[in-house]
């Protein structure tokens, strides 16, 4: 896998101006499917469908989200499962993964993409996150034991992870977190999925349209300030998201640009 090459390899790749793509379907093997407990044919078909969504379509979907995120400061994420988390966006351009590695990506040191893709990522201000985040999608990591975690529940106080629990598979997170080092406890970024053909495929959860992801740990590659090498991403589908009190996503679907007078129409779970 490209992502597991060493520092020297990446240094040489940058000097050479290399661009690369990780083709996810190549890793959707029967062995991996058995480890994850999924049907390999279903997994592969979903990845293929997601891979043929064009970069232009993903870029068009991303554009209105990026425009609103650029103007926003505070984000509140809610869901009937108990999620109620408030974070603050760093003053940095959102990163759009649309399947192309362009000049801006290379200037920022991002040399590769994944196929399928489709995600907008925004770094967060440290020391601000407050509330509860509960994932409702599995997190897959073929190199972990166990390789699947479910029901990640994180409680944040004053920008730091205060406590955590999992419905299943939490031992693998606990081991990674214990050796994560400084910065591991800080939420690093939010992600917003764009790809309409991805729903439940392992290892690409963050690109599924209608999902919000929370990255715990380092965010330097996204323009953030946290240099931690620890990174753990969990995802939440069908969330309600507000930007500065205005509706941004309702049940995971984008809300057209709202005006200040629309503030009261922001959907509250269980209304």
Segments (PLM) and residue ranges:
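Active-site bordering "gate/hinge" segments
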Residues: 1-130, 258-271
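Short, glycine-/Ser/Thr-/acidic-enriched flexible segments
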Residues: 29, 82, 92, 138-140, ...
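Short helix/loop capping segments that flank catalytic or ligand/cofactor-binding pockets
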Residues: 32-35, 85-88, 95-98, 142-144, ...
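Short polybasic amphipathic segments
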Residues: 74-77, 152, 162-164, 238-247
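Long, well-ordered mid-to-C-terminal structural blocks that present hydrophobic/aromatic surfaces
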Residues: 125-175
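Dual-mode signal for accessory low-complexity, basic/Gly-rich regions
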Residues: 147-148, 163-226, 241
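Internal helix-turn-beta structural module
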Residues: 200-270
């Amino acid at each position: 896998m490209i992502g597991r090459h060493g520092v020297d390899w990446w240094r040489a790749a940058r000097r050479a101006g290399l661009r690369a793509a990780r083709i996810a379907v190549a890793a959707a093997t029967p062995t991996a499917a058995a480890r994850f407990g999924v049907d390999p044919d279903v997994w592969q078909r979903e990845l293929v469908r997601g891979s043929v969504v064009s970069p232009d379509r993903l870029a068009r979907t991303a554009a209105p989200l990026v425009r609103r995120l650029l103007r926003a400061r505070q984000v509140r994420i809610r869901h009937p499962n108990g999620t109620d988390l408030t974070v603050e966006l760093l003053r940095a351009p959102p990163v759009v993964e649309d399947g192309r590695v362009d000049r801006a990506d290379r200037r920022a040191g991002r040399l590769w993409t994944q196929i399928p893709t489709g995600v907008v990522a925004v770094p967060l201000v440290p020391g601000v996150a407050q509330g509860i985040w509960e994932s409702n999608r599995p997190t897959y990591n073929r190199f972990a034991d166990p390789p699947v975690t479910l029901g990640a529940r994180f409680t944040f106080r004053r920008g730091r992870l205060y406590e955590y629990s999992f419905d299943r598979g939490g031992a693998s997170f606990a081991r990674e977190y214990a050796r994560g080092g400084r910065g591991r406890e800080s939420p690093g970024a939010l992600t917003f999925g764009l790809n309409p053909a991805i729903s439940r495929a392992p290892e690409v959860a963050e690109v599924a349209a209608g999902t919000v992801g929370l990255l715990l740990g380092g965010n330097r590659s996204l323009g953030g300030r946290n240099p931690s090498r620890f990174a753990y991403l969990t995802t939440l589908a069908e969330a309600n998201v507000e930007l500065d009190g205005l509706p941004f996503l309702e049940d995971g679907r984008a809300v057209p640009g709202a005006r200040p007078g629309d503030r009261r129409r922001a959907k509250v779970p269980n209304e």
